[in-house]
Every structure is written in structure tokens, then in C-alpha cells.
């Protein structure tokens, strides 16, 4: 959307009565919408905001309106009937929330001219903005993800939300009747989700044979492999290994070690990587940061630290970060 033809209009010291925000949108050649109609949370608004140039009538809650403008990456306009000092403080607060502030006006007539002076506005990174970016990226990829912890209500609720948003193809591991019952009790629609009972699936025997072959040098027998495949993390990892899923999301009810161990035994590390590591993606101060390694290697060697830095930078780049690496004190 264009910064010169989009804006979010909020008020202070007055209401929206007598302000023709819709006509302002028409003058700018933009779509008009009311923030209240788009949702009650920033993540809802980010999904439902109209495409292209848009003029939004805010809620009148200046704090929320400023956060919405920052998240959407559109200029923030304040229509004020308050004392100058109050307006100045409100604008300063809006800037502190990341909003690109155009100014405070007594009516909308001066807004188009003020917007013309704005060169460009980019969305300020926040948890909601990052979530939308991730969902958009996942939706474009159309990946098939296996969720091994089907007994966890959070997994069922997350699966329902992902299916409603058409984000990915999903497989849940668990007893089909139990998963269906939990979904019904939670009011979650799992239409389109594949549910595999890993304990009774014919895939279990195939996976056991493959695992026994992979681990035969470690002395793993077929009978031991069959027992191993009763573990949802191993079964799900074998699905990824065999190309039956593109990825696995685990850890809701298991430790990091329990989740990583099957991958290390079956899939191994990427070419050029000798050590397993992790990164944490965190939104702070309007930016997206990647921290690695905070979970796997408590006392890495100098060589391992260097390798972790390189691998972490490559992973960060996949999430839109232009990586500049800083080595923190260990």
C-alpha cells in the first residue's frame, strides 16, 4: 500500500462524530474501513485489512490505534480537540510504539497534503507482524507437517487454526477416536487433517525395518526397532525421512532432547554441519532477532561456536533477517 494514499486516523479530545473519514478515503483513491470491523486483535487485523491503499478509522483508543498503524506500516494521523501539550504527548507516545506519525490536525482537510510529504513507511516488527509473515510464508510453501503429540489439546487447537487459515497440510499422530473426541469437546474442526494411529499403522513395520537398517552398526535389532517406533517422535521423524511429510513440529509435551534425538539418529545433520544446534527467534525493540545456540550445546568448543554462528546466520536469513553475527560472552 502507498504511504501517500493510506492512513490510520485516530482521535483525542473528541469522538469521530462529524469527521468524514470515508470521504477522505475517496479523495485519496483508497478503500475505507473501520478498525473495529477488522478484528479486536492485531493479528486479526493484519489478516483482514483490505489489499491496496486503505484509510482506516481507528477505535479512538490511541494506544491501540498507534500499534495497529505500526504493524500495518501505514501513517498515523491524529485528529485532536485537546490542548497542544496533550496532543504533543500523544504523538510522542505513538512514535514510541513505532507508528509513523503524520501529525495532529483539527479536521481531515489537511490530511492529504500532509500525507504527500511522507516518503515511505514499513511495518514495524512485532509478534503479530512476525506471525503473519510466518503464516504467509507457510501458506505459500504448502508443506505437509506432522504433529506427533495428538493427545495434547494445544496441538488440536493449533491444528484447527492452521486448517481454518489453509496454512498447511497436517497429519496428527494419535488414536483417531480419541483425537476426534477431544476436538469435539474443544469445538475444533479438524476436517482435512489426517490422523494416524502410529501404534496400529502398517507404516510402523516399514519404519521399523528402515530404522533397524539405519542403526544396524549400532547393534539395533528389528525387534528393538519395532519398540522404538512406538515412540511418536521416532515415528514422525521416519515420516519426514521417508518423504511422507515435509516437517515435524514437536516439543509441546516432550523435552528438547527427546525431540532432537530421533532426528539426529535418522536424518542426521546438514552437509557441512558436525553439531546439532538451535536458534530462538525473538521480537524485541521492533526488530526480529535470532539467538543460537540457547538449548542444545551447554559448553561448545571454539570450532563448534564458529560452526553454530555460520549455521545460525543461514537459518536467520531464511526468516528474512539480514544476518550480522555478534558473539556473546559464553
Can you name each region flagged by the protein language model?
Residues 1-14, 22, 26, 88-129:
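C-terminal lobe/tail of nucleotide-utilizing enzymes
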Residues 42-50, 93-96, 234-240:
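Short, well-structured alpha-helical segments in soluble
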Residues 1-89:
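ATP-dependent carboxylate-amine ligase catalytic core
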Residues 75-80, 103, 146-147, 169-172:
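Short hydrophobic alpha-helical runs that function as membrane-insertion/retention elements
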Residues 124-330:
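Anion-binding alpha/beta catalytic cores of soluble intermediary-metabolism enzymes, centered on
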Residues 16-20, 84-90, 110-111, 155, ...:
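Short, charged/polar "capping" segments at the starts of alpha-helices
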Residues 39, 108-113, 198-205:
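A short acidic, often aromatic-flanked loop/helix-cap motif at beta-alpha or helix-coil junctions
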Residues 56-57, 78-81, 105, 292-293, ...:
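Short beta-strands and strand-loop turn motifs
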